[in-house]
């Protein structure tokens, strides 16, 4: 089941509908509460994914006809980026749910979805998965099973620049704030490609190869006709989150 959403409220509503289908049609009735594991990509509140997770969590508990036993794990992917280093997270998850049958796994965002997919057979081979808040580019259909559902963002990257030009038509230069973690390097490539048609209209400067202090200095020296587009910054060029 694949659902695409363009807005955060729409995404949360679609995720709740998918969760209901997975929880109450793909699992058998039980007197025990429904056990749901939410997997976060980052180790701290990081918008928009933390906002999506918070809304989903609150609405799921509020609207469920049965008790929800909720578990949450944060992977801190900004710091732990090599898959060889994720064994402690696997062991923690194993200990967290030992002796308990999970009814649904909900990874929020693409990095947590990749982690869950890599370790699925080891941790929860028969549990349905609902991927929420990843972009459609990141989750190919072949990576899903018949027990999975996805509620994906459909990001219109050129629309970001179009919106800047609509709000500030005098803009001649845009600085793109984006970090240098693996996920940010992916998005830098996507942004560069999708922004290319506007290269003759705007000077586009990329901050992905700068430290945070260098970003601040560069931003402070920008001319009045420049705009800053903050896309994603979880790790700067020095590897500092």
Regions from the PLM with identified roles:
Residues 2-241:
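Short hydrophobic alpha-helices and adjacent helix-cap/hinge residues
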């Amino acid at each position: 089941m694949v659902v695409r959403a363009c807005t955060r409220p729409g995404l949360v509503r679609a995720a709740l509908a998918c969760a209901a289908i997975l929880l109450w049609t793909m699992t058998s009735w039980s007197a025990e509460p429904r056990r749901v594991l939410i997997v976060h990509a980052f180790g701290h509140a990081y918008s928009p994914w933390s906002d999506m997770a918070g809304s989903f969590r609150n609405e799921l508990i509020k609207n469920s006809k049965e008790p929800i036993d909720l578990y949450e794990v944060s992977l801190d992917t900004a710091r732990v980026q090599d898959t060889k280093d994720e064994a402690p997270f696997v062991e923690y998850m194993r200990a967290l749910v030992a002796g308990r049958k999970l009814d649904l796994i909900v990874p929020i965002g693409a990095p947590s979805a990749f982690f869950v997919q890599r370790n699925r057979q080891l941790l929860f081979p028969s549990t349905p998965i609902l991927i929420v808040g990843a972009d459609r580019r990141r989750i190919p259909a072949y990576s899903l099973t018949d027990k999975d559902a996805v509620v994906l963002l459909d990001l219109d990257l050129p629309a970001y620049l179009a919106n800047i030009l609509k709000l500030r038509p005098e803009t001649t230069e845009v600085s793109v704030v984006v970090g240098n973690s693996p996920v940010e390097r992916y998005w830098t490539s996507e942004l560069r490609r999708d922004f290319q048609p506007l290269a003759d209209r705007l000077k586009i400067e990329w901050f992905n190869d700068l430290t945070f202090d260098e970003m601040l200095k560069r931003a402070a020296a920008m001319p009045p006709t420049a705009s800053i587009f903050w896309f994603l910054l979880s790790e700067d060029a020095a590897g500092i989150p």
